Amino acid sequence: MRSVTRDQKPTVRVAATGDLHCREDQHGRFRNFVKHVNEVADVLLLCGDLTDRGTPEEAKTLAEDLAALRIPCVAVFGNHDYEAGAIKQVCAELAKATVHVLDGDHYVYEKTLGVAGTKGFAGGFGRATLQAFGEGTTKAFVQEGVNESLKLEAALGQLETPKKVVMLHYSPIVDTCVGEVPEIIPFLGTSRLSHPIDHYGAAVVFHGHCHFGSREGKTPGGVRVLNVAMPLLAKTTPDQRFALVEV
């Protein structure tokens, strides 16, 4: 049993991963993963692309394994989860395994840790961030990134917990995209997501999406950012396909 002094807040062991890309026929694929998480973590965060094609059948297969979790599970969706246009059905299947899906809102663990989550979106980084100028389609693309940033801002603004973490699918910084083909980096995230993070603060940010990116970076304000895409973790820490952080 972990002991704390009167003035300390209990440490929460957060396991985080993303980009599971579960397919309909992959029954039992995540059974050992769930067993491992149960042994070492207090809460599990799934950072998008839970399914490969966004079908309810894929979500049902994943939920079969996640149902064995003995700890809370919180998720955001990724771009793959929207592919089939069945996001409500996907959400319903995951709810059967008590997965809490965030979309611009938050989850609170034992009044100590607040989790703010949204999918995020693309748009580029720093001085190369795409601006809302020109064609209507360009403006709509930029506005989607702005909307996701505002959703994250709202989620963080609602939290009054002593500790906060952020979960996204898309990256809020360019550093964790390094290693990807340079031409696709503007589609892996946007700096707009980092603005509410630096304004409200967080202990750590988790994201996925960047299968060939880098493991870690920081926002301009110094908040730690971890890329927890499972394909990347499979290469760097094959025996533990999730990040484990004490907050």
Language-model features, listed with the residues they occupy:
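N-terminal active-site segment of His-dependent metallophosphoesterases
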Residues: 1-71, 82-85, 138, 142-143, ...
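Binuclear metal-dependent phosphoesterase catalytic core
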Residues: 2, 10-11, 88, 109, ...
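Structural motif
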Residues: 12-14, 42-43, 113-114, 163-165, ...
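Active-site neighborhood of phospho(di)ester-bond hydrolases with catalytic His/Asp-centered motifs
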Residues: 16-18, 44-49, 73-79, 100-105, ...
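Conserved catalytic scaffold of divalent metal-dependent phosphoesterases
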Residues: 20-22, 88-187, 229-230
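Metal-dependent catalytic neighborhoods of phosphoester/phosphodiester hydrolases
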Residues: 26-29, 50-67, 77, 82-97, ...
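Short, well-ordered alpha-helix to beta-strand connector turns
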Residues: 41, 70, 98, 161-162, ...
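Cap/insert and terminal regions of metallo-dependent hydrolase folds
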Residues: 62-66, 171-200
